[in-house]
Amino acid sequence: ITPASAKVQYPRGITFNDDGSKMYVTGTTSGGVVGMYSLTTNYDVSTASFVAKTTIGGIAQDIRFNNDGTKMFTAAFNGSDGASNSTIREFALNTAYDIRTIADVDNPEEYNPQAIDTGQVDGLAFNNDGTKMYTTDRTDGAEKIHEYSLSTGFDLTSTITHLGSIDISGLGTLAPTSLIFNPDGTTMFL
């Protein structure tokens, strides 16, 4: 698929549903969108066909779901400088993994990681039970990965604690916009 034919311009983040039969892509056109695609062969993007897109506001950078697909999370920012109003957003879905059923697209739960001095939040990941959240950001030429604990898994209204960060500027990455872990959490991919 190509961005022009895919209905989502300037794609940034990508994720799949639990069985790989659906793919989701965030785009930064017109205030941030999420596109949903059906895959006739699981995890084979060459078999993708466009299903729907939903405007979610902000400039959507990355996307993740909780384990049962009833919550969708995006890393997004508002403002041309990228750093202003960076947020992690939590959207409730009435039907698992179906972006057309977002309960209240205009009022998602939000967490503002800038309270701990991060820059533009781009990447977003969770551990398997959602009690740890990871973000990537860019601040003044430095690229970092931040780790947070959530008192309740996959719940941005729970107590969120910043556990620390590492500077990855010298690792050969250039402003990573996404991150993900292997199933047992021993390997991180940027």
Enumerate the predicted regions with their spans.
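Polar, enzyme-active/binding microenvironments
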Residues: 1-190
